[in-house]
Design a protein with these regions (language model features):
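Alpha-helical transmembrane segments of multi-pass membrane transport and lipid-handling proteins
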Residues: 2, 6, 102-131, 142, ...
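Interhelical loop/hinge segments that connect adjacent transmembrane helices in multipass membrane
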Residues: 3-22, 211-254, 294-311, 432-446, ...
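Membrane-water interface segments that mark the loop-to-transmembrane alpha-helix transition
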Residues: 23-36, 62, 71-124, 138-139, ...
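Transmembrane helical elements of multi-pass membrane transporters/channels
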Residues: 25-44, 56, 176, 200-207, ...
C-alpha cells in the first residue's frame, strides 16, 4: 500500500518530454505488463488444475465472445477520446476539459447499453453456433454485464491517460491484475465450470470499480446532459470507429493467415505459427505497452506543433529502440531453450521462424511512434488506409513465403511486411506532416540493426558452444551500447548513485 502511495506521488510530479520521462514511463508500464503476464500464468495454471482442458476451452470461448462483443459495440472510445482530451489538458482549458469528460462518459454509457443489448440479442444464436451440448444461452447473456462494464472502464481509462494520471493508472492496473487472481481462483476451485462466467463478470466489475475510484478523484461524477454532447462526441466516435475497423481488419487477416496455413499446410503449422507469433509479440509488448498509455496522449497534446511533434516522436523512437534492442538479441539467443520450457519439444521446429520474426520488431519499434501521428491528428481515414495496407502486405507475404520456404518463410514474411510498413508510414509522415527523422535515430538504428542481423546470422551459421558464446557477446555489446547512450541522455548513472548513496 505504501508503495502505491509513493508511486502516485512520484508520478504526479510535473511531466516533461525529456528522455528521462520516456524511460521512466516505458519502464513503469513495461513492469506492469510483466506483472500482468506473471499473474496470467498463475491464473492459467489454476484453470488447468481446477477446470481441466475442457474448462479452459469453455473459458476461452466465452472470453472470445466477450472480446468480439466489446469490439463491435465499444465505438473505440478508449482510443478515440484521447486526442481531444489531451489537447484540452495541454492547453489547460479546464472548463472545456470538464465538459468533454462528460461527453466521453455519456458516450461510454451509450456504448455500454449497446454492448449489453448486443450480448442479450445474439446469445441464442451464439449458443447454437458454438455448442452441441447443453443450453448456454444464459452464459452468453450474462456476458452482457461484463461487456457493459468494460465499455465504462474504457472511457475512464481514456480520461486518465489523456490527463496524465499515469501514476494512478499504473496503480489501478496493478490492483486489477491482483484482484483478478484473488477473485477467479476460489471460484474455479469451489465451482469448477460453473464459476467461469461469474469470474469473468466479477473481474470486469472489480476493474470498473478500481478505475472509477481513481478517475473520479480528479473528475468527480456530474450529470449535466445537453444534446450538444452527442454532437460534440462525433469526431471522437469517427476516430474510435476507424480504430475498431482497423482492429477488425487485423483480426480478419489473422483468421485468413491461419486458415491458409491449415489448408496448404496442416493444423500443426497453425499451432507452431501461433506459438512463435505469440512469443515475439508478447515479449516486444513489454516496451510497446507504454506507447498507448503515455506517448500517445503526449503526442496528441502537441499534434499541431510540427517541431514539438518531431521532438517527441524521435525521443520515443530512441528510448524504445535502445531498451528493446538488447532484449531482442537476448530473445533470439534463448529461443532454443525457451520454447521447450513454455510449450514442449514438439514446438522446436518453430525456433527458426521465431528467430527471424524477431527482426521484424526492430522495424516495428521504428514505425510505431511515427504511425501515432496520424491518430494524434485525428485523421481516421488515413489511419485506416495505412493499417489496412499493412495487413494486405502481411497476408500476401505469408502466402508467397510459406509456399517457398515453409514455416520459416512465415517469419521472413513478417519481417518483409514490417519493412514495407516502415517505408510506407515514414514516407507518408514525411510528406503529410513534415516529419524528419534525426541523425541520432539513424545512428542508433544502424548500430542496433547491425547487431540484430549479426545475431540472426549466428543462429544460421553456428552451433553448440560457438553459438552461445557469440550470441552472449552480441547481447552484451548491444546492452552496453544502450546503457552508454541512455546514461548520457538521462543522467541515469548519477540518479542511481544518488539513490544508492554511492
Amino acid at each position: 500500500m505504501y508503495f502505491c502511495v509513493f508511486l502516485e506521488e512520484k508520478m504526479s510530479k510535473k511531466h516533461d518530454d525529456s528522455y528521462s520521462h520516456v524511460l521512466k514511463y516505458t519502464s513503469l508500464f513495461g513492469g506492469v505488463q510483466v506483472l500482468s503476464i506473471m499473474i496470467g500464468l498463475v491464473r492459467n495454471k489454476a484453470m488447468a488444475l481446477f477446470l481441466g482442458a475442457a474448462g479452459m476451452g469453455f473459458n476461452a470461448l466465452l472470453i472470445s465472445m466477450q472480446n468480439f462483443a466489446s469490439q463491435c459495440t465499444n465505438l473505440g472510445i478508449s482510443f478515440g477520446a484521447v486526442p481531444r482530451l489531451s489537447e484540452l489538458h495541454e492547453h489547460q482549458d479546464d472548463e472545456k476539459l470538464h465538459y468533454y469528460v462528460q461527453v466521453v462518459r455519456l458516450w461510454s454509457m451509450i456504448a455500454a447499453v449497446l454492448g449489453l443489448l448486443f450480448c442479450v440479442i445474439v446469445s441464442p444464436l451464439m449458443n447454437q453456433l458454438s455448442f452441441t451440448w447443453g443450453d448456454h444461452t444464459l452464459h452468453y447473456a450474462m456476458l452482457a454485464l461484463a461487456v457493459a462494464m468494460i465499455a465504462i472502464t474504457g472511457g475512464e481509462t481514456a480520461i486518465m491517460k489523456a490527463t496524465r494520471q499515469l501514476g494512478r493508472l499504473a496503480i489501478a492496473q496493478i490492483f486489477t491484475v491482483i484482484v483478478s487472481l484473488i477473485v477467479s481462483v476460489p471460484l474455479y476451485y469451489y465451482y469448477s465450470h460453473s464459476g467461469v462466467v461469474p469470474a469473468i463478470v466479477l473481474i470486469a466489475f472489480a476493474t470498473m470499480l478500481i478505475t472509477l475510484f481513481y478517475s473520479y478523484r480528479t473528475f468527480p461524477f456530474r450529470f449535466d446532459f445537453h444534446r450538444s454532447m452527442l454532437r460534440d462526441g462525433a469526431s471522437m466516435i469517427r476516430l474510435g470507429v476507424a480504430f475498431v475497423l482497423a482492429a477488425a481488419i487485423g483480426s480478419a487477416s489473422e483468421v485468413a493467415i491461419r486458415a491458409y496455413l491449415n489448408v496448404v499446410g496442416s493444423m500443426d503449422d497453425v499451432g507452431l505459427y501461433n506459438a512463435a507469433f505469440m512469443i515475439t509479440i508478447t515479449y516486444a509488448g513489454l516496451v510497446f505497452s507504454a506507447m498507448e498509455t503515455d506517448y500517445f496522449p503526449r503526442l496528441s497534446g502537441v499534434a499541431n506543433d510540427y517541431e514539438a511533434t518531431n521532438s517527441i516522436v524521435n525521443k520515443q523512437i530512441e528510448v524504445s529502440l535502445l531498451l528493446l534492442a538488447p532484449m531482442l538479441v537476448a530473445l533470439m539467443m534463448v529461443l532454443p531453450m525457451l520454447i521447450p520450457i513454455l510449450f514442449s519439444n514438439e514446438f522446436l521446429p518453430v525456433v527458426g521462424m521465431a528467430q527471424v520474426a524477431v527482426l521484424a520488431m526492430y522495424f516495428k519499434v521504428l514505425t510505431m511512434p511515427v504511425s501515432y501521428i496520424t491518430l494524434a491528428r485525428r485523421l481516421s481515414l488515413s489511419f485506416l488506409l495505412l493499417e489496412s495496407s499493412y495487413y494486405v502486405i502481411l497476408v500476401l507475404a505469408i502466402v508467397c513465403c510459406f509456399q517457398c520456404w515453409g514455416l520459416w518463410g512465415t517469419g521472413l514474411a513478417i519481417v518483409i511486411a514490417h519493412v514495407l510498413e516502415n517505408v510506407l508510414v515514414m514516407g507518408y509522415a514525411t510528406w503529410k506532416y513534415g516529419y524528419r527523422i534525426t541523425s541520432a535515430v539513424l545512428r542508433y538504428a544502424a548500430f542496433q540493426l547491425t547487431i540484430g542481423f549479426g545475431a540472426f546470422a549466428v543462429t544460421m551459421l553456428c552451433e553448440g558452444f560457438l553459438y552461445w558464446i557469440t550470441e552472449a557477446a552480441l547481447t552484451i555489446v548491444s546492452t552496453a551500447y544502450s546503457i552508454h547512450v541512455l546514461r548520457q541522455k538521462t543522467h541515469l548513472w548519477e540518479r542511481l548513485r544518488s539513490k544508492l548513496r554511492i
